[in-house]
Amino acid sequence: MTTATQLLKSFTLWEFLKAHALTLKYFFKPKATINYPFEKNPLSPRFRGEHALRRYPNGEERCIACKLCEAVCPAQAITIESEPRDDGSRRTTRYDIDMTKCIYCGFCQEACPVDAIVEGPNFEYSTETREELLYDKAKLLANGDKWERAIAANLEADAPYR
């Protein structure tokens, strides 16, 4: 480019006009964002959100205390203690997840033979203290009860790919 052309473009503010033309081009197009708290995008059935412990339809918890999720967790965020029951089966007495350590990899969900521990659809959970991110068995079961319908639908939608 010649010096005269560069000088002419600088005097006419050519770049400024190009920027405004680009702005006007997108100004009249439909918006590309959503109004988040009021509108939400659909989540994938494979979305990994807040953890939950599921129950059987009769109300009994699914976890059989095999501790596979604890063993497979790369962040060592899961702690399980169990005791044998009168009928010879094991059940958990303590099931804790330290959400500050969790990396949401989904290995715990994949390792569970009875689909007891799952990562649900909830991604909107915040706390004021770190202690609230230490989930115990009661909190995990409450999450499972709260999100059971959505969790079951997600697992059913994902079943052909498992």
UniProtKB/Swiss-Prot annotation:
Pfam families: Fer4_7. [4Fe-4S] cluster 2 binds at C73, C102, C105, C108. The gene is nuoI. It is found in: Cell inner membrane. Signal peptide: none annotated. It comes from Erythrobacter litoralis (strain HTCC2594). NDH-1 is composed of 14 different subunits. Subunits NuoA, H, J, K, L, M, N constitute the membrane sector of the complex. GO terms for biological process: aerobic respiration. This is NADH-quinone oxidoreductase subunit I. Its EC number is 7.1.1.-.
